[in-house]
């Protein structure tokens, strides 16, 4: 044992740790590293047990506090027969893991070189089969899952063909995710890339690339059964102080970034800088929008109220979706700048759903650069389409400001629903159908004059 303590790290290829399967070998190395205070395990490319460049995971690898796992040019895949995550913190699914005093900490998963964590072949565990016919909950089907943990670092890896969400956090804080690539051929439902669920705060998410089968990144704070049962006693349930920057990716019809909160859970102090839609112009499976804020769906007992989604700062966005930004339900005290759409039939900012109440929201620097071509048959539209603001679904707008907006062609510059008060400045559109369509109680002031 003394000789083991002298090693700078352990590997699952060390003879002392080789088990009956790859997950057992890795777990033995991690457990011993933790017990002896070595606290570092390296998973190399070649698997000594099988002499193959792969690690097949049939049970969850449990990570204790103060553990660094280095993935050295390795390929890891979930076995088709497995109904479990690849990595979790060791108390993630334990009852005592719901206690604040059992918060785990200082867990690092870092990749070196070309590292892939794959969901492998689908195992039949889907949202519609979750908990049925002897199957466990779909919440066991992530690649990584962390619950009641802090100071988590995940970096320099590729997530491939996840079976549900790639990386998921619940009641976690002070975490950093960087240099993560999501690579999905959509073949099962709801293949989000990175998900922050209830009770997450103080995250940095940066340098994210790739394509997801659903939302690329989702901040979702709702009180569904799992989020309620596994709530950490006395812990802040809100989502706040999240920094997201330099995201270049694509989503299969959904969103590059979703922000959603309901059921009294608040979302605030979210900063986004650099969200770039890299879908191909000819693609028929573009993201619905670069970013979607809110929804009139998905709540358990009540929708979010005005002021519960606030202090959202969105900068440097480009999109080929039906809108660059979709807003639903509520949004307050927020700022958007340098928002571009390159789609041929898109609105720059659009409300959606049954309701959209906005208060103290500024849109500064909006650009529409589409050529107004029908993507289905490559012919020009007979009439200009799209809007700077398509707020047809809006039900309230107090102190909404739009300034410095530019477009080649638009059908209706401002499409306002009910009770919208919009102040616009410096609007420049080369070819325009009409400036304003408005509903009851709405008005537009353009450069100081009411339209």
Task: Give the location of each predicted region.
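Extracellular/periplasmic carbohydrate-active domains that bind, remodel
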Residues: 1-451
């Amino acid at each position: 044992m003394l000789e083991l303590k002298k090693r700078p790290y352990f590997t699952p290829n060390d003879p002392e740790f080789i088990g009956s399967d790859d997950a057992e070998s890795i777990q033995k190395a991690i457990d011993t590293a933790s017990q002896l205070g070595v606290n570092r395990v390296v998973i190399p490319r070649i698997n000594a047990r099988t002499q193959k460049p792969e690690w097949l995971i049939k049970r969850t690898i449990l990570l204790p506090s103060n553990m660094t796992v280095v993935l050295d040019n390795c390929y890891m895949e979930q076995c088709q027969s497995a109904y479990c995550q690849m990595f979790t913190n060791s108390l993630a699914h334990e009852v005592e893991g719901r206690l604040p005093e059992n918060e785990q900490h200082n867990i690092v998963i870092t990749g070196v070189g070309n590292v892939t964590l794959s969901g492998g072949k689908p195992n039949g565990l889907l949202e519609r089969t979750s908990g049925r016919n002897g199957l466990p909950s779909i919440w066991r089907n992530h690649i990584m899952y962390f619950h009641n943990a802090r100071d988590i670092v995940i970096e320099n890896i590729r997530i491939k063909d996840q079976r549900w969400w790639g990386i998921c956090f619940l009641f976690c804080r002070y975490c950093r995710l960087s240099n993560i690539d999501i690579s999905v051929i959509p073949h099962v439902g709801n293949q989000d890339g990175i998900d922050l669920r209830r009770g997450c705060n103080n995250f940095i998410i940066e340098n994210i690339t790739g394509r997801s089968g659903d939302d690329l990144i989702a901040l979702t704070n709702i009180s569904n059964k799992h989020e309620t049962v596994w709530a950490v006693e006395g812990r802040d349930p809100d989502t706040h102080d999240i920094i997201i920057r330099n995201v270049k990716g694509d989503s299969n019809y959904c969103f590059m970034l979703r922000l959603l909160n309901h059921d009294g859970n608040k979302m605030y102090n979210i900063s986004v800088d650099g969200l770039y839609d890299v879908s191909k112009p000819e693609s028929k499976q573009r993201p619905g929008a670069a970013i979607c804020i809110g929804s009139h769906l998905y709540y358990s007992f009540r929708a979010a109220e005005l002021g519960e989604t606030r202090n959202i700062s969105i900068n440097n966005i480009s999109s080929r979706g039906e809108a660059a930004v979709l807003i639903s339900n509520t949004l307050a005290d927020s700022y958007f700048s340098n928002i571009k759409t390159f789609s041929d039939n898109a609105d720059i900012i659009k409300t959606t759903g049954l309701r959209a109440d906005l208060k103290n929201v500024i849109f500064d620097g909006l650009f529409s650069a589409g050529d107004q071509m029908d993507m289905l048959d490559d012919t020009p539209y007979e009439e200009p389409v799209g809007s700077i603001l398509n707020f047809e679904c809006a039900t309230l707008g107090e102190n909404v400001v739009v300034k410095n907006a530019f477009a080649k062609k638009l059908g209706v510059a401002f499409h306002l629903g009910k009770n919208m008060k919009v102040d616009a400045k410096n609007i420049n559109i080369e070819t325009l159908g009409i400036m304003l369509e408005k509903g009851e109680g709405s008005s537009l002031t353009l450069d100081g004059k009411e339209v």
